[in-house]
Amino acid sequence: MTSPSVHSLTTPQIKNWHRSNISIFILLGMGFTAMATRMPLVKADLGVTASQLGLILLATGLGSLGGLNLVGWLIARWGTRLWILWMFPVFTLDVILGAVFVENHFTLGYVFTYVLSGFVMGMVDVANNVDGTALEKATNRILMPRMHAGYSIGTLIAAGWGALSSAIHLSLTLMLLPIVLAQLALPFMVHR
Protein backbone atom coordinates (compact mmCIF):
# COMPACT_ATOMS: atom_id res chain seq x y z
CA MET A 1 0.00 0.00 0.00
CA THR A 2 1.23 3.58 0.14
CA SER A 3 4.90 4.09 0.93
CA PRO A 4 7.57 6.69 0.10
CA SER A 5 9.09 4.44 -2.58
CA VAL A 6 6.03 3.90 -4.79
CA HIS A 7 7.82 5.29 -7.84
CA SER A 8 10.52 2.60 -7.62
CA LEU A 9 8.03 -0.27 -7.87
CA THR A 10 8.29 -2.80 -10.68
CA THR A 11 5.43 -3.50 -13.08
CA PRO A 12 4.51 -6.79 -11.33
CA GLN A 13 4.44 -4.96 -7.99
CA ILE A 14 2.14 -2.28 -9.43
CA LYS A 15 -0.17 -4.99 -10.82
CA ASN A 16 -0.24 -6.76 -7.45
CA TRP A 17 -1.03 -3.47 -5.73
CA HIS A 18 -3.90 -2.86 -8.15
CA ARG A 19 -5.29 -6.39 -7.69
CA SER A 20 -5.02 -6.03 -3.91
CA ASN A 21 -6.95 -2.77 -3.98
CA ILE A 22 -9.72 -4.28 -6.12
CA SER A 23 -9.85 -7.35 -3.84
CA ILE A 24 -10.37 -5.15 -0.80
CA PHE A 25 -13.24 -3.34 -2.50
CA ILE A 26 -14.83 -6.67 -3.51
CA LEU A 27 -14.62 -7.96 0.06
CA LEU A 28 -16.03 -4.70 1.46
CA GLY A 29 -19.01 -5.02 -0.86
CA MET A 30 -19.52 -8.64 0.15
CA GLY A 31 -19.30 -7.93 3.87
CA PHE A 32 -21.67 -5.00 3.75
CA THR A 33 -24.30 -6.62 1.52
CA ALA A 34 -24.39 -10.12 3.00
CA MET A 35 -26.59 -9.26 5.98
CA ALA A 36 -28.76 -6.89 3.95
CA THR A 37 -30.10 -9.83 1.95
CA ARG A 38 -31.36 -11.44 5.14
CA MET A 39 -33.06 -8.45 6.78
CA PRO A 40 -36.50 -10.16 6.90
CA LEU A 41 -34.89 -12.95 8.95
CA VAL A 42 -33.01 -10.43 11.11
CA LYS A 43 -36.26 -8.55 11.78
CA ALA A 44 -38.09 -11.76 12.73
CA ASP A 45 -35.29 -13.19 14.90
CA LEU A 46 -34.83 -9.94 16.80
CA GLY A 47 -38.59 -9.46 17.15
CA VAL A 48 -38.48 -5.83 16.06
CA THR A 49 -40.82 -3.75 13.93
CA ALA A 50 -39.82 -2.32 10.55
CA SER A 51 -39.32 1.12 12.10
CA GLN A 52 -37.21 -0.33 14.92
CA LEU A 53 -35.08 -2.16 12.36
CA GLY A 54 -34.65 1.13 10.51
CA LEU A 55 -33.37 2.73 13.70
CA ILE A 56 -30.97 -0.18 14.23
CA LEU A 57 -29.60 0.35 10.71
CA LEU A 58 -28.87 4.00 11.58
CA ALA A 59 -26.20 2.66 13.92
CA THR A 60 -23.94 2.01 10.93
CA GLY A 61 -24.02 5.69 10.00
CA LEU A 62 -23.25 6.72 13.57
CA GLY A 63 -20.28 4.39 13.71
CA SER A 64 -19.10 5.58 10.33
CA LEU A 65 -19.03 9.20 11.50
CA GLY A 66 -16.66 8.23 14.28
CA GLY A 67 -14.34 6.25 12.02
CA LEU A 68 -14.31 8.88 9.30
CA ASN A 69 -13.30 11.56 11.79
CA LEU A 70 -10.27 9.51 12.90
CA VAL A 71 -9.06 7.80 9.76
CA GLY A 72 -7.31 10.78 8.16
CA TRP A 73 -5.13 11.28 11.21
CA LEU A 74 -4.44 7.55 11.52
CA ILE A 75 -3.46 7.20 7.85
CA ALA A 76 -1.20 10.25 8.03
CA ARG A 77 0.52 8.74 11.04
CA TRP A 78 0.79 5.05 10.05
CA GLY A 79 -0.17 4.73 6.38
CA THR A 80 -3.01 2.90 4.64
CA ARG A 81 -1.71 -0.65 4.74
CA LEU A 82 -1.70 -0.88 8.53
CA TRP A 83 -5.31 0.29 8.84
CA ILE A 84 -6.58 -1.98 6.12
CA LEU A 85 -4.79 -5.02 7.53
CA TRP A 86 -5.78 -4.29 11.14
CA MET A 87 -9.33 -3.12 10.62
CA PHE A 88 -10.46 -5.67 8.05
CA PRO A 89 -10.28 -8.63 10.47
CA VAL A 90 -12.22 -6.53 13.00
CA PHE A 91 -14.87 -5.88 10.33
CA THR A 92 -14.97 -9.58 9.46
CA LEU A 93 -15.36 -10.75 13.05
CA ASP A 94 -17.95 -8.04 13.65
CA VAL A 95 -20.07 -9.33 10.75
CA ILE A 96 -20.09 -12.87 12.14
CA LEU A 97 -20.71 -11.60 15.68
CA GLY A 98 -23.75 -9.72 14.37
CA ALA A 99 -25.12 -12.98 12.97
CA VAL A 100 -24.55 -14.75 16.29
CA PHE A 101 -26.38 -11.95 18.12
CA VAL A 102 -29.32 -12.20 15.71
CA GLU A 103 -29.50 -15.97 16.09
CA ASN A 104 -29.53 -15.50 19.88
CA HIS A 105 -32.15 -12.70 19.74
CA PHE A 106 -29.77 -10.16 21.33
CA THR A 107 -30.90 -6.85 19.82
CA LEU A 108 -28.54 -4.58 21.79
CA GLY A 109 -25.56 -6.71 20.76
CA TYR A 110 -26.65 -6.47 17.13
CA VAL A 111 -26.88 -2.68 17.42
CA PHE A 112 -23.33 -2.63 18.82
CA THR A 113 -22.07 -4.67 15.85
CA TYR A 114 -23.69 -2.21 13.46
CA VAL A 115 -22.00 0.74 15.17
CA LEU A 116 -18.64 -1.05 15.05
CA SER A 117 -19.23 -2.16 11.46
CA GLY A 118 -19.85 1.43 10.35
CA PHE A 119 -16.80 2.65 12.26
CA VAL A 120 -14.45 0.05 10.80
CA MET A 121 -15.90 -0.09 7.29
CA GLY A 122 -15.63 3.69 6.94
CA MET A 123 -11.98 3.53 7.97
CA VAL A 124 -11.12 0.68 5.59
CA ASP A 125 -13.00 2.32 2.73
CA VAL A 126 -11.19 5.64 3.14
CA ALA A 127 -7.81 3.94 3.57
CA ASN A 128 -8.39 1.91 0.42
CA ASN A 129 -9.45 5.02 -1.52
CA VAL A 130 -6.34 6.90 -0.36
CA ASP A 131 -4.29 3.89 -1.38
CA GLY A 132 -6.01 3.81 -4.77
CA THR A 133 -5.23 7.48 -5.27
CA ALA A 134 -1.55 6.78 -4.53
CA LEU A 135 -1.65 3.97 -7.09
CA GLU A 136 -3.14 6.32 -9.68
CA LYS A 137 -0.35 8.83 -9.01
CA ALA A 138 2.32 6.11 -9.20
CA THR A 139 1.02 4.89 -12.57
CA ASN A 140 -0.22 8.22 -13.93
CA ARG A 141 -3.44 6.40 -14.92
CA ILE A 142 -7.09 6.66 -13.91
CA LEU A 143 -7.80 3.39 -12.10
CA MET A 144 -10.34 4.31 -9.43
CA PRO A 145 -13.48 3.46 -11.49
CA ARG A 146 -12.25 -0.11 -11.89
CA MET A 147 -11.42 -0.30 -8.19
CA HIS A 148 -14.87 0.92 -7.22
CA ALA A 149 -16.39 -1.59 -9.64
CA GLY A 150 -14.88 -4.19 -7.33
CA TYR A 151 -17.26 -3.04 -4.59
CA SER A 152 -20.20 -3.54 -6.95
CA ILE A 153 -18.94 -7.00 -7.85
CA GLY A 154 -18.79 -7.81 -4.14
CA THR A 155 -22.37 -6.64 -3.61
CA LEU A 156 -23.56 -8.77 -6.54
CA ILE A 157 -21.78 -11.86 -5.20
CA ALA A 158 -23.15 -11.36 -1.69
CA ALA A 159 -26.67 -10.57 -2.89
CA GLY A 160 -26.75 -13.72 -5.01
CA TRP A 161 -25.30 -15.83 -2.23
CA GLY A 162 -27.69 -14.29 0.31
CA ALA A 163 -30.71 -14.99 -1.89
CA LEU A 164 -29.61 -18.59 -2.42
CA SER A 165 -28.90 -19.00 1.30
CA SER A 166 -32.35 -17.72 2.11
CA ALA A 167 -33.96 -20.07 -0.42
CA ILE A 168 -32.22 -23.10 1.09
CA HIS A 169 -32.76 -21.84 4.66
CA LEU A 170 -29.11 -21.53 5.70
CA SER A 171 -28.56 -19.89 9.06
CA LEU A 172 -26.97 -16.44 9.06
CA THR A 173 -23.75 -17.83 10.48
CA LEU A 174 -23.45 -20.55 7.84
CA MET A 175 -24.30 -18.06 5.10
CA LEU A 176 -21.53 -15.74 6.28
CA LEU A 177 -18.89 -18.45 6.67
CA PRO A 178 -17.54 -18.39 3.06
CA ILE A 179 -17.51 -14.58 3.09
CA VAL A 180 -15.65 -14.54 6.42
CA LEU A 181 -13.10 -17.04 5.12
CA ALA A 182 -12.52 -14.90 2.03
CA GLN A 183 -12.11 -11.81 4.19
CA LEU A 184 -9.70 -13.54 6.56
CA ALA A 185 -7.54 -14.39 3.53
CA LEU A 186 -7.12 -10.64 2.91
CA PRO A 187 -3.65 -10.30 4.50
CA PHE A 188 -2.39 -12.84 1.96
CA MET A 189 -3.87 -10.81 -0.92
CA VAL A 190 -2.60 -7.39 0.13
CA HIS A 191 0.99 -7.24 -1.02
CA ARG A 192 3.38 -5.68 -3.46
Predicted regions and their residues:
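Pair of pore-lining "gating" transmembrane helices in MFS-fold secondary transporters
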Residues: 10-44, 115-116
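Hydrophobic core of transmembrane alpha-helices in multi-pass small-molecule transporters
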Residues: 26, 94, 105-124
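Short hydrophobic/small-residue motifs within alpha-helical transmembrane segments
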Residues: 61-62, 152-154
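Helix-to-loop junctions at the C-terminal end of transmembrane segments
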Residues: 67-80, 166
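Primarily marks hydrophobic transmembrane alpha-helices of the MFS/SLC 12-helix fold
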Residues: 81-88
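C-terminal ends and interior cores of transmembrane alpha-helices
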Residues: 89-104
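Cytoplasmic helix-loop-helix junction between adjacent transmembrane helices
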Residues: 113-150
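Symmetry-related core transmembrane helices of the 12-TM Major Facilitator Superfamily/SLC fold
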Residues: 173-191
